[in-house]
Every structure is written in C-alpha cells, then in structure tokens.
Amino acid sequence: MAEKKAEKRAEKRKFNTEAWEPKTQIGRMVKEGTISDINYIMDKGLPLLEPEIVDALLPDLEEQVLDVKLVQRMHKSGRRARYRATVVVGNKNGYVGVGMGKSKEVGPAIRKAIAHAKLSLIKVRVGCGSWECGCGSPHSIPFTAKGACGSVKVELLPAPRGVGLVAGNVAKAVLGLAGIKDAWTKTFGDTRTTYNFAEATFDALNNLNFVRCLPAQKEKLGLTEGRVL
C-alpha cells in the first residue's frame, strides 16, 4: 500500500514537457530538444531563469525541506507575519541547489523556495582527496573548501571511504543530495540559523569549482564534475 502511494506521488511530480510554455530562449531550446544536457547551459554560463528547465533536464531531482519558520516585520499598521522556508534540491549525483522562499502561507513559501533552489543549481566536484584513502573513486571531495553566509562559516575536508558525513543535520542534507558520501566538516558561528548554515555549505561546494587542477592531479584525485556515470 505504501509503495503504491509512493508511486502515485512520483507520477504527480513527473514534469509534463508538452504542457510547459517556456518564456525564455533557453527554455524554448530545451523544449525543442536543441539543448538536452544541463552541463551545456552551465559550461556556457547561460542564465537559468525558469525552474522548468531543471525539471526537464534533471528529472531525478529530489527535494528536502530543511526549515519552515514564522518571521515578522514591523509595519506602520503593526506586525506583519510571513512564513520562511528553506529547501535543498539535488539528484545525489553531482548537482545541488539551496533556496529560500517567503509567503503568507506555508505551501506557497515552500514552492517559492524549491523554485529558487532549482535556479541556484550548481555542478559539484567530487573525488578522493584524503591522504588516508587514495582510492581515486568519487566518494568524497577532492580538496578542502570553505564557505560562509552571515556569521556562519563552514570548512569541508576530504575523508576516507567509510567515514560517512561527519556534519550537522543541515550540512549533511546538502552534502547528501550533492552526492558526497564521506566528508569531515568544521563549523563556526551561529549554526542555529538554518538558511545561513545551508547556504554556507552550498558556498563551500561552489568554491570547489574555482580551483584549477592539472590533468595529472585530476587523475590522481579521481576528480569528476557533475554526474558520475
């Protein structure tokens, strides 16, 4: 019974390309089949302006709600309350995104956060950078990376196979959906702020993409960008 319900939910989540009416040139090219790989868009630096592009090119994307909070701001008519949702999306195979959405209701806030996370999607570099392992398979990160958001700072370190994700629940969710299986983390600042913690972890993963490597180093580290075949 539970399996049937899960299958029905999966069918509802399936993206209907035929019903989609793209609003941008890239969206039209994706619908026509001219662009069939999301790596082409990312490598060319083309802007992702429609979340439906990600739905069409990455159908195996998963979503996880990290936090939903009631936030308030002062107005001349009094306090105004809204819900703020933090969401992480990823396919557990080299792609991840983090987003935040606000609305007067929980549902629209989560949907906005999911759309924002899809538009912030990045490729993640994976490999084996731990001196204790050296297996060359893409189970960890290739080298140390740092990220920050607000007062929160996160440092990611490569770990040998079998260690798992030694991190807080928020960082563990982001790293897990990125496809990283083993990593150590160091955190500084007020990590109770879920969005800042998630964004700092996401920033650290993004900073992996700005390190230049020689072909020999890539081979030694087992460095892979994006989807691992």
From Swiss-Prot:
InterPro entries: Ribosomal_Su5_D2-typ_SF, Ribosomal_uS5, Ribosomal_uS5_arc, Ribosomal_uS5_C, Ribosomal_uS5_euk/arc, Ribosomal_uS5_N, Ribosomal_uS5_N_CS, Ribsml_uS5_D2-typ_fold_subgr. Pfam families: Ribosomal_S5, Ribosomal_S5_C. One of its GO terms (molecular function) is structural constituent of ribosome. Keywords: Ribonucleoprotein, Ribosomal protein, RNA-binding, rRNA-binding. PROSITE patterns: RIBOSOMAL_S5, S5_DSRBD. With S4 and S12 plays an important role in translational accuracy. Part of the 30S ribosomal subunit. Contacts protein S4. This is Small ribosomal subunit protein uS5. It comes from Methanococcus maripaludis (strain C6 / ATCC BAA-1332). The gene is rps5.
